[in-house]
A protein has these predicted regions:
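Beta-propeller domain segments
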Residues: 5-35, 42-44, 65, 73, ...
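Beta-propeller domains
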Residues: 15-36, 59-107, 145, 153-160
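Conserved beta-strand position repeated once per blade in WD40 beta-propeller domains
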Residues: 52-55, 124, 189, 243, ...
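Residue-level detector of Asp-centered blade-edge/turn motifs that repeat once per structural unit
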Residues: 56-60, 127-130, 192-195, 247-250, ...
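Conserved beta-propeller blade signature
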Residues: 62-66, 131-135, 197-201, 252-256, ...
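Short coil/turn segments at the loop-to-beta-strand junctions that recur within blades
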Residues: 89, 167-172, 238-241, 384-388
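Asp-box/WD-like beta-propeller blade repeats and closely related beta-sheet repeat scaffolds
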Residues: 116-120, 143-191
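Aromatic- and glycine-enriched pocket-lining scaffold segments that form the walls
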Residues: 179-205, 214, 219
Length: 402
């Protein structure tokens, strides 16, 4: 984990950068620290087998960390008392009942090296009051997968997980319409809205035709009723939704999404609309299929999925911000109630801080990021130098999992 000490009021910073308005991010970053988790947790596979695949949250002022392979742990010290070397205690769970060792070792699938890729793994954790929620890639039947949800009552000694949301719909590795499969494109981000409701993202697993099917759970953001396990579609046409942040002040959901080759997106999703907001995948995108239009193996793909640059011309919603080339976008969070946000990246190994004035009628979509900045929007890139899989904001500090 990596800590940014954010204090909007102080005037001195180690990393100084300025904006062109009173909403400046200069002086926000006061100092940084890097923490090394204790070796016992590392041996269980937090970083050794799944590059930059760990997920963070807080509970009772302590840092909670879950590895991609399902190891759950908490810090001995409270966040305000952290030392440079973190000491984690493992929490016993029954998560092996749902995602045992055999699932992670699915190497028989085209001789895929699970140690290198971590296709089938934990995708996020989220703690709300005394409940913990975990998303993961679930094998519904032999070699057929989706993204599902578990939940349990928080306890630092033992957590018993139960199913919260799953579906019989799954994408088969061998037998699917698009003849492609990629479990990295699984989404899995969780945010709790209130006692009854959470939002949950699911990617397309590279089964592109499902994105425009309203009856499919894939390429969607779902609203899950935690009491009934029922769901409804909040938005659709998403390739791989990696980040979610609910801005309660404006009743807006900010979504960060992996594009294909180019075309990572930040979308502003208005909630509770009569029509399901549709963001265009896999008909419109500011990216290209891997290999581009000139690759012979892509000719049929572009016929079915043309990736038009315009979204509005084809009845879709334009992204608020898009990145071309891609940055390998991950989590997005709000920093305070003053419309300041930060989005993390894996490929670009950077943080992008930005401010958005919801009352500025001159800001239209889409907005392309060029060299870390974008016209009409205050944005600043801060290079970290490591892949950033997850981050949380707690007590004016950013904690990053690298």
């Amino acid at each position: 984990p990596y800590e940014f000490d954010l204090n909007i009021k102080k005037l001195n910073s180690d990393l100084e950068f300025s904006f062109n308005s009173e909403h400046s991010f200069s002086n926000d970053i006061i100092n940084t620290r890097v923490f090394s988790p204790n070796k016992n947790i590392l041996l269980y596979g937090i970083a050794n087998h799944f590059p930059a695949s760990g997920y963070l949250d807080t509970y009772n002022k302590k840092l909670i960390l879950m590895s991609a392979s399902g190891v759950l742990a908490y810090t001995n010290s409270k966040l305000e008392n952290l030392k440079n070397n973190l000491t984690f205690n493992q929490i016993k769970t029954n998560i092996g009942k749902f995602i045992g060792e055999e699932q992670f070792r699915k190497s028989r699938i085209h001789d895929f090296d699970w140690l290198e890729g971590g296709w089938f793994s934990i995708k996020d954790i989220n703690i709300y009051k005394d409940q913990i929620f975990v998303s993961y890639t679930r094998e519904v039947r032999e070699d057929c997968w989706n993204t599902s949800l578990l939940h349990g009552k928080m306890n630092l000694k033992l957590i018993i997980f139960e199913n919260l949301f799953t579906s019989d719909e799954c994408v088969h590795f061998y037998d699917n319409v698009d003849s492609e499969f990629n479990a990295h494109q699984s989404g899995g981000r969780i945010i709790n809205i209130d006692d009854d409701t959470l939002l949950f993202s699911i990617g397309d697993f590279r089964s592109r035709f499902r994105a425009q099917n309203k009856d499919s759970i894939f390429s969607k953001i779902l609203e899950i009723n935690k009491k009934t396990n029922g769901y409804r579609v909040i938005s659709m046409g998403h390739r791989n939704p990696q980040g979610l942040f609910f801005d309660a002040k404006h009743n807006i959901l900010l979504e960060a999404e992996h594009g294909p080759e180019g075309g990572d997106e930040i979308n502003l999703i208005k909630l509770n609309q009569q029509e399901i907001p549709n963001y265009g995948w896999a008909i419109s995108s500011y990216g290209e299929h891997y290999g581009g239009k000139n690759a012979a193996y892509n000719k049929k793909k572009y016929v079915k999925y043309p990736l038009h640059k315009s979204h509005t011309e084809y009845g879709f919603i334009e992204p608020f911000i898009y990145f071309d080339p891609s940055i390998g976008i991950s989590q997005i969070i709000g920093l305070n109630e003053k419309n300041k946000y930060v989005v993390a990246s894996m490929k670009d190994e950077s943080l992008y801080f930005f401010y958005y004035d919801y009352d500025d009628k001159n800001i239209n979509s889409p907005n392309k990021v060029v060299n870390g900045s974008v016209d009409n929007i205050d944005m600043k890139r801060v290079h970290i130098g490591e892949r950033i899989r997850d981050m949380i904001y707690y007590n004016e500090k950013l904690y990053l999992y690298l």
